[in-house]
Each structure stands twice: as structure tokens, then as C-alpha cells.
Amino acid sequence: MAAARASLGRILPESSILFLCDLQEKFRPSIAYFPQIVSVAARMLKVARLLDVPILLTEQYPEGLGPTVPELGAQGIRPVSKTCFSMVPALQKELDGRSQLQSVLLCGIETQACILNTALDLLHRGLQVHVVVDACSSRSQVDRLVALARMRQSGAFLATSESLILQLVRDASHPQFKEIQKIIKEPVPDSGLLSLFQGQSPLTSC
């Protein structure tokens, strides 16, 4: 029964963590829909703060690729520098110190590189991975689509930001619901997902 429940991919604030991967200045010109995915990642960050979900932020080689973009709203969160195409080695101590952790919500770039490798490492550790599809992108939309399919095939859950936010809050009687409602009432920017998924089979062939 425990395994069956785990396979549903339910998330709770007390056993979840938000990963924000490499949303840095030098990627701005090259990543498809960069402003849009940063905007969605920012709403996930706001909700995580309201619900006391821990947040971890990485930067890939910041000396060359620059700092995290200010519009993410991550001021006050200490970024962890890395060179590996996975967040996990740099965050190993943080993960090891969280015995209640079950679910990781994953946002950032690039989908086929650091997001995919992070997801695989987390799955290998026995954690549930929830890829926030409207908060992840790549330079190539083909890479983005195939990487999402690859993660799903490996056992990750694909979900939109609003779906995950509502799973976290669970109930309109939650004391933070009115604040969260303001966030989800703001229009979600188009990050090209409809055109990306239309007529494609990789997401449905598992």
C-alpha cells in the first residue's frame, strides 16, 4: 500500500522542497521563453515562502555565467555554486540533513542538461520528482520536449505550476489561501508548451 500511495505523487509542504536551477543572467538571450519561465519560477518561490517549503538555489559556474536574475525574487537565498550538470552533488549535505524529505519540485534550465540530470539523481535517491513544466526550458525546443519525456519515462511527475500550488495548499480554508489565490489569479505567461506538445508522441509513450 505504501508503494501504491507513493506512486500517486502527492505532495505536502512539510515533506517537499523547491529546487531553482541556474536561472542566471548569461542564459537570458539564448534560452527559449526565458522571461516566462523565470516568472513562473518566481511564483513557485512566492508560494514556497508562504507555505514554509524550503528553497534551494544553484548557479552554474557563476564566474562566467553571471548571477541569478533579480526578477526571480530570490534575494535572501544563498546560491550554491556548481559545475556539475546536476544540482545534487552540490546540495548533498542539504539533502542528507532532511530526513522527512519525500518530494522535490524542480524548476530551471536547461531541461535536457541540469534539469534532467538532477531529476535522475534525485530519483536514484528514492525521492519523488515533480518537474514544473512551465518553469523549465532549453535553447532547443526539441531538447526540451524529449528531456521532459525522458524524465517521465524514468518516473518523474510532470505538472504545471498551478497544479502543484493547489496540491500544496490542498484546502481553501488554509490560512495562506487568500495570499496564494492572488498569485494563481495572475495570468501564467505562455512558455510555448501548447505548441511544444501538440501532435507530439514522446510525452504519451512511456
From Swiss-Prot:
Any Gene Ontology CC annotation: nucleus
Transmembrane recorded as keyword: no
Pfam families: Isochorismatase (PF00857)
Compartments, record wording: Cytoplasm; Nucleus
Residue numbers of N6-acetyllysine PTMs: K93, K178, K182, K185
Coiled coil spans: none
Keyword Acetylation set for record: yes
Principal place of residence: cytoplasm
Modified residues (N6-succinyllysine): K26, K93, K178
Subunit structure: Interacts with CDKN2A.
Protein name per Swiss-Prot or TrEMBL: Isochorismatase domain-containing protein 2A
